[in-house]
Amino acid sequence: MVNFGKRLMADQLEEWKEYYINYKMMKKKVKQYVQQTQNGGRNREQVLKEFSRMLDDQIEKIVLFLLQQQGHLASRIEKLGEERALLMEQADASQISELREAYREVGIDLMKLLRFVDMNATGIRKILKKFDKRFGYKFTDYYVSTRANHPCSQLQQIFKQVGIVAVVGALSRNLAFLQDHQGNFPSIYDHPSITLKDPIIEQINHSVQKLTHATNLLQFIGQHALIIPEDMHSGSEDLVDDQSYHFMSLLLNLANTFLYMVNTYIIVPTADDYSVSLGAAATVCGVIIGSMAVAQVFSSVYFSAWSNKSYFRPLVFSSIMLFLGNLLYALAYDVNSLTVLIVGRLLCGLGSARAVNRRYISDCVPLKTRLQASAGFVSASALGMACGPALAGLLQTNFKIYGFTFDQNTLPGWIMCLAWITYLFWLWISFKEPDHIVRENSVNTPSSDSGHRRNSNLEDGLAQPFLIDAKESLDENGEDNDENEEDPEDSHKPATSLAAAYRLLTPSVKVQLLIYFMLKFAMEILLSESSVVTTFYFNWSTSTVAMFLAVLGLTVLPVNVIVGSYVTNLFQDRQILVASEIMVLIGIAMSFRFTSHYSVPQYVSSALITFVFAEVLEGVNLSLLSRVMSSRLSRGTYNGGLLSTEAGTLARVAADMTITAAGYLGQNSLLNVTLLPSFVICVASIVATFCTYNSLY
């Protein structure tokens, strides 16, 4: 294995040699600092100041050279533009072809500049990690907090990529114009949807896409789903291209997501009435609702593992289990069995294929459309969450057919039976197994892609976040061999068990998972007990409860649009995270019943605050989680999406069990008793957030 220092020397351009990071010198400095501090020759404050100044000098050297080279490229494009104007009058095809090649040469030089940025970014990441490890101090936290967000930050000058993107735009526009020397080709600025099919431009765009981490709406919503593209961390190549991508199969996965969320929430407004009709207490609704989440804890693991071999078969199995589960749920009333009802919900939980839906988007959708697909996953979930209760509110009827009861309690089961059998038929005739799955199943030995990887050497490593992820594995070649500093974490092999995945969790990741657990717990308490609480205090009907829950669900997408489009451009994610946690805490505190009189305005306003800011918190939390999580958790069975799903599912189980347990104290005490754990967990998550605040980048 070639260490990074040797690779840097081998790969750097000779004419740019003096402008690369002096990695060897800085590595020696780190060793000196360790020895000096151990001998008492220097204190930590002196070392931090000196090393910070040295790193500032290195970054400034890189930035100034980068700006200089961007200027040279801009000058060349300007001169070529003058030649283009003259050639358009002559319409000489051979000279136009030569001019097109000249533009492409500029593109090749731009690729070299991108490689320059990549090598230096990797060097800075590695020296920061080396300092943390050898010196025993979280220098990365200090350095990032004082440099990355400064108005004159040179780090932002590198990674905002404004100059490089402008050069790409100029190259694309001129090459597009030269495709039709009559000038009839539409401008890329007038028609943004038109993409230039030029190999150089496509390579540059792909590299810039990996290197740039600008905040935008699709990225925010896509990260909300915690669908972590493998190449966003490791630089590995896409498993799918435009030709093998099957849109209908993606649509079927999104439909599965939508129907499952409808299935989850359609029973919430009537679960308490159903349990009472079967002779149980109203608060047993917690068991009825939560049993689906209990089964999902296990189904998420086997579905995630199954998706390594197939996507079609897990979706078929999911549809069958959900059909059977809903059938039992609908029949439970006529057989007068609470056990049948709960078994039906357990079967529904065993049919949860959300892990497959996430995995399909991550592995089988081209990179350029993956964010849109991820946003579609979140949107389908939000729409299903709103449609479930709304649909339940419309099912206010009561009749019998051949002895089977159809009323507000059983109709959700019958409706979902029909929905899943229809979906299964659509799945059977329309789904296409991805090509790479077919190849892996038919060929025992994996095909070699070494040639392809050699061609993509420029992009190798561009995907890694620059400073936001100092605890991740930093480079496929690991730490320098001569120091024996490579951790097991630095391997790119995926985790092979939940225990192995847990060992990869840094304190920052653990805190983010705690926050995710907290917000899911608070939301589940709010939603699952809403029917019991509103009936007890306000005497709301099923239709009113359903409308209230539907309105809450409809806030999800607008909130994500506002946060993703505006708020994240004004504040850091970690600032939004803390503010949202505090607002959730305020919402929970407002929900407590302090006096004998509990009003509708108090309940509705506190519920809106809790739910809306929990949604904001979820988006920002998963966005941060996708950045601070190890690259080894971006793929394999035990991936980041599975861990977050398990954390959220366990939170739902705990919340529903809390509701049922609190029911033994009487409905008069239910509200305050169930809110108390939410309040305590929220306070704990806020404290934990402040403890890891400087590492949340």
Curated annotation (Swiss-Prot):
It comes from the Eukaryota. GO terms for cellular component: membrane. Its main location: membrane. PROSITE patterns: SPX. One of its GO terms (molecular function) is transmembrane transporter activity. Residues 2-145 form the SPX domain. The chain crosses the membrane at residues 247-267, 278-298, 315-335, 338-356, 375-395, 411-431, 513-533, 544-564, 576-596, 604-624, 670-690. It is found in: Membrane. Keywords: Membrane, Transmembrane, Transmembrane helix. It holds the Pfam family SPX. It is a multi-pass membrane protein. Belongs to the major facilitator superfamily. This is SPX domain-containing membrane protein OsI_08463. The lineage of its organism: Eukaryota, Viridiplantae, Streptophyta, Embryophyta, Tracheophyta.
